[in-house]
């Protein structure tokens, strides 16, 4: 089942449901622009962009918030709420879409267990290591059970060992059926994981290597 399709004069990309895809390329190659297009932070100015059956280039503004519920997004800088503990950071993603307290109390501990942070639910971001903060960000991205997880340089601020742990976690998430798209500069991780790799240059996908 096709999850993502981009067609224009520069890019022709198809991603199937349940795939794990790396996007690599030098700074300014268009990797982060691709993430912003998929998040509907930027508008598609030409061609077609279809994600989970939604035509993004034709999407009305009022539809965007509902579409974004299908996505989980993780960033290099974690983007956690500094004045909220781990539990509250993750619960926040459910509150903004109107989930009940009962649902939140059941789901948040589940996802914290999934990312290995069940014991840290009362900790605040500044009490956590970089790797732990990224796990919180992952839990927040996963708590609403997204179809697609977008990770923009998720290991950019982490040491090699912690980076490897985060990538293993992303792989486990993918094995449960979530489509995962990872933008990265980290060649070691890309080479080690042997997944599909898209290489971008000047906004164009110049190679698409499938393992």
Specify the residue positions occupied by each region the protein language model found.
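Short, small-residue-biased leader/transition segments that mark boundaries at the very start
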Residues: 1-6
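Helix-to-loop junction immediately C-terminal to a conserved catalytic motif
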Residues: 39
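Conserved ABC transporter NBD signature motif
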Residues: 47-55
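Short coil-to-helix segment of the ABC ATPase nucleotide-binding domain corresponding to the Q-loop/switch region
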Residues: 84-91
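Conserved ABC ATPase signature
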Residues: 124-128, 132-134
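Conserved catalytic motifs of ABC-family nucleotide-binding domains
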Residues: 145
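Catalytic Walker B motif of ABC-type/P-loop ATPase nucleotide-binding domains
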Residues: 149-152
